């Protein structure tokens, strides 16, 4: 015999999982700060003033590639990457630099199919606690 109260936690879990799946990603309303295109490939950078989302598309399904990012005099990132099954690649970036109020970030993504790059400016945002 099934106890009615045993179903309550299971039902609650289903409702929470459904609500979480329906929620928009936290970055869905971030404005675009930079964009580049090469044929079917696109590179888009969106941000909220502190965090930035770097997204490339059209690289080719599961394609090998390179991701390059530089920010002032920091040692640049130069990574081997693999695109997702849909040909996309996404990373988040926090452009904080000690003793710097801002700067310019260069981002480049390439695969055998294309090469896209763009730059965007960042500025340190003061945190105001109310």
Q: How would you name each of these model-derived features?
A:
Residues 21-130:
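Extracytoplasmic/secretory-pathway segments with low complexity and glycosylation-like composition
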Residues 8-16:
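Bacterial N-terminal signal peptides
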Residues 1-9:
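Bacterial N-terminal signal peptides that target proteins for export
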